[in-house]
């Protein structure tokens, strides 16, 4: 039996909410009548309108404390969106081992830690987890072994989580193509998108996330691919 549609968005914790896709999700959740909260290493300041906890998602203890603090402030959590992510470009031999493992720590282990910490709150309300993967969770490319490995892992984790928590938690994997955000700003020029690159707007992906959050209990959007109409690399 399903509940009415659209389901209220509710109290949504967004990792990486200070910039990029995460910031767009914060705006979209608020526009849909929800109550966003942010976990990020980078300070988030909108005059106190949005609950914020500073944490490095690769540190599970910091994540646990951040989730607990936000849950206490909001009197619970209805959903999490794992938008925090980083990349280190270069061949396997070129990327320092510590930096390579850092990508896994943030993208994969940070996702796991966030969901694990939020799970007790989410299961109380049959909440939702929207887990952000990437089109590079479906195909491998050169000079991106860390990022591809992390996102392949995120996709596998999300699918297994959906099976493990069926009937208790809604799980959606978002699979976005490249987005027009600051994600590429610190890359060497050879790894930045070209002037003719087909990128989606973060706000478009954020609206898709809200769509998943609004699905009634009993209806699941398991995987959602967001890409340009003429996506050249799909799949």
Predicted regions and their residues:
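Active-site helix of classical SDR
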Residues: 115, 150
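Residue(s) in the substrate-gating loop at a strand-loop-helix junction
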Residues: 134
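C-terminal helical subdomain
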Residues: 173-174, 193-234
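The beta1-alpha1 cofactor-binding region of Rossmann-like NAD(H)/NADP(H)-dependent oxidoreductases
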Residues: 55-65, 97
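Conserved NAD(P)H cofactor-binding loop of Rossmann-fold oxidoreductase domains
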Residues: 83-88
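Conserved glycine-rich cofactor-binding loop
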Residues: 18-19
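Substrate-binding pocket helix/loop in short-chain dehydrogenase/reductase
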Residues: 91-92, 99-101
């Amino acid at each position: 039996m399903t509940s009415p549609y659209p389901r209220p968005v509710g109290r949504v914790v967004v990792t990486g909410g200070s910039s990029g896709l995460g910031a767009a999700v914060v705006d979209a959740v608020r526009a849909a009548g929800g109550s966003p909260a942010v976990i990020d290493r980078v300070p988030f300041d909108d005059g106190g309108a949005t609950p914020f906890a500073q944490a490095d998602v690769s540190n599970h203890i910091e994540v646990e404390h951040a989730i607990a603090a936000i849950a206490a402030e909001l009197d619970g959590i209805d959903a999490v969106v794992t938008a925090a992510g980083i990349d280190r470009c270069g061949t396997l031999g070129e990327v320092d081992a510590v930096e390579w493992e850092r990508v896994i720590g943030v993208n994969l282990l940070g996702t796991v830690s966030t969901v694990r910490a939020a799970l007790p709150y989410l299961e109380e309300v049959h909440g939702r987890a929207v887990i952000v993967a990437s089109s590079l969770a479906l195909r491998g490319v050169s000079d991106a072994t860390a990022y591809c490995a992390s996102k392949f892992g995120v996709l596998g984790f999300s699918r297994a989580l959906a099976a493990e928590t069926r009937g208790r938690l809604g799980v959606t994997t978002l699979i976005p193509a490249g987005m027009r955000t600051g994600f590429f700003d610190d890359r060497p020029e050879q790894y930045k998108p070209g002037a003719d690159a087909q990128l989606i707007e973060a706000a478009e992906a954020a609206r898709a996330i809200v769509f998943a959050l609004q699905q009634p209990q009993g209806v699941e959007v398991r995987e959602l691919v967001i890409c340009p109409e003429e996506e050249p690399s799909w799949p």
